[in-house]
């Protein structure tokens, strides 16, 4: 949760946006804008949910976490930790990179994180090979709630057959080779979506959600 101490700490780290605008992966990004929020995902065994006639919005196909421990705040160069985490999640889901049709990125709007994640996504899936979105342009980083919020966004994207745009971003930094969704929602044929959350201290998490 946001509080004065947290804001002061992030401010001293120069992690907060001086413009007050969260614009993930944008060439003009200058830091994040603290957010608050919550999301609840109800998880149930497939057979049990089917038996009781539940309305299924998505299926968890796989997940993984690791700890690069490169630096207490900075990501590992080239997104090495993120690369390993996404590949572990793919292996857990028994999927190949070509099976992923959307990346719900961690995308905090900080110069270092976004550059590292873009490099990692390009390495794992290929340059510009898969649509990328960060919902933090709307929510900002909600700290402990970020993963649940973004997983919920991924489920809703599948349910509505629309990839939301990355708010406030007009296009990716020219140094990045990613297909960033901007401007308007993009229709798509829902399929496996990887949702990333990469935190301080090099701890990384990736989950893969698919249509039910």
For the regions a protein language model found, what residue spans apply to each?
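A glycine- and small-aliphatic-rich helix-loop capping segment at beta-alpha/alpha-beta transitions
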Residues: 8-19, 77-81, 116-128, 210-212
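Conserved beta-strand-centric core segments of catalytic alpha/beta enzyme folds
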Residues: 1-48, 146-212
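Beta-strand segments within the central parallel beta-sheet cores of soluble alpha/beta enzyme folds
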Residues: 1, 55-63, 98-105, 131-137, ...
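Short glycine/threonine-rich loop-to-helix capping motif typified by GTGT followed
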Residues: 70-82, 108-125, 142-149
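Active-site/binding-pocket entry motifs
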Residues: 16, 65-66, 109, 175
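Short helix-capping segments at alpha-helix termini
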Residues: 53, 93-96, 123-129
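Glycine/charged-rich beta-loop-alpha catalytic/anionic-binding loops adjacent to active sites
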Residues: 19-27, 67, 128-138, 189
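Condensing-enzyme catalytic core mediating Claisen C-C bond formation in acyl metabolism
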Residues: 20-93, 101-102, 169
């Amino acid at each position: 949760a946001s509080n004065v101490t947290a804001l002061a700490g992030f401010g001293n780290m120069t992690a907060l946006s001086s413009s007050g605008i969260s614009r993930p992966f944008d060439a003009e990004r200058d830091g994040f804008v603290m957010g608050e929020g919550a999301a609840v995902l109800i998880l149930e065994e497939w057979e049990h949910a089917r038996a009781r006639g539940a309305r299924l919005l998505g299926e968890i196909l796989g997940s993984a976490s690791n700890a690069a421990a490169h630096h207490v705040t900075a990501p590992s160069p080239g997104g090495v930790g993120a690369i390993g985490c996404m590949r572990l999640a793919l292996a857990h889901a028994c999927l190949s990179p070509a099976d992923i049709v959307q990346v719900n990125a961690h995308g905090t709007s900080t110069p270092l994180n976004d550059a590292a994640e873009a490099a990692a996504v390009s390495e794992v899936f290929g340059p510009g090979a898969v649509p990328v979105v960060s919902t933090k342009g709307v929510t900002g980083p909600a700290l402990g709630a970020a993963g649940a919020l973004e997983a919920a966004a991924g489920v809703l994207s599948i349910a509505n057959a629309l990839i939301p745009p990355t708010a406030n971003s007009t296009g990716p930094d020219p140094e990045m080779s990613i297909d960033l969704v901007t401007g308007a929602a993009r229709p798509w044929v829902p399929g496996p979506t990887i949702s990333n959350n990469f935190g301080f201290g090099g701890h990384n998490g990736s989950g893969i959600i698919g249509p039910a």
